[in-house]
A protein has these predicted regions:
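Conserved SGNH/GDSL esterase-like catalytic core that processes O-acyl groups on lipids
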Residues: 2-8, 12-84, 108
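Alpha-helical cap/lid subdomain in secreted, periplasmic
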Residues: 55-161
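Conserved catalytic region of serine esterases and O-acyltransferases that act on ester linkages
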Residues: 165
Length: 165
C-alpha cells in the first residue's frame, strides 16, 4: 500500500521539486508513497481556498496527508493565514486525511522574521490539531551550524539545492 500525499503551496513547494524530495526520503525509510502537488508561484493559502481544483483534489484524491505551505515573503497577515488553514483543515478532515503545516523560512538577511512566522504556524497547528513540520526552524538551525553551505538560491528567498536537501 502506498502513502498518498498532496502538497498545496507556492514556489517554496515546487522549487527543487520538494514533493519528490520528500517522497525520496520516505522511500529511503521503506515507506512507499505517491505525491501530488498543487502549487502556484506567489500564492497564499487563501487563494487556494478559492480554487475549485483544490477542494476537489482534497475531497476525491484519497490522500493520507495534505501538506499546506503558506506564502512566506512577505508572511501574513496572520488572520488570513489562520482563516485559510481552518477552512483547508476542515476539508482535509472531512476527506479522512491528516493536515500537515509546512513551516517555511525567512528571507536572507531577515532572520528576525522567523520567530513571527514560527509562532503563527505553531498557533494555528495547535488550534486546528494539524501536524507541524517546522522546516523553517530546522532550516535556520542547520544554516547557523553550517555557515559555509549556501542554503539560499540566488534570489535570497528560495532554497538552493543544498537548502532543499
Amino acid at each position: 500500500m502506498k502513502l498518498r500525499i498532496l502538497f498545496i503551496g507556492n514556489s517554496h513547494t515546487y522549487y527543487n521539486d520538494m514533493p519528490a524530495l520528500a517522497a525520496a526520503e520516505l522511500e529511503k525509510q521503506g515507506i512507499r508513497c505517491e505525491v501530488t502537488m498543487i502549487a502556484h508561484g506567489g500564492w497564499f493559502l487563501e487563494q487556494h481556498v478559492q480554487e475549485p481544483d483544490v477542494k476537489f483534489n482534497i475531497r476525491y484524491g484519497h490522500y493520507d496527508y495534505v501538506v499546506l505551505q503558506e506564502h512566506a515573503h512577505p508572511f501574513g497577515p496572520e488572520e488570513k493565514f489562520y482563516g485559510a488553514v481552518r477552512c483547508l483543515t476542515e476539508w482535509i478532515r472531512q476527506a479522512s486525511a491528516r493536515p500537515v503545516l509546512y513551516m517555511t523560512w525567512a528571507k536572507k538577511g531577515e532572520e528576525g522574521e522567523q520567530p513571527r512566522m514560527s509562532a503563527a504556524y505553531r498557533e494555528i497547528a495547535r488550534k486546528t490539531g494539524a501536524l507541524l513540520a517546522p522546516v523553517g526552524e530546522l532550516w535556520w538551525e542547520y544554516r547557523r551550524s553550517h555557515p559555509k553551505i549556501e542554503m539560499y538560491d540566488g534570489d535570497g528567498a528560495h532554497a538552493s539545492a543544498a537548502g532543499s536537501a
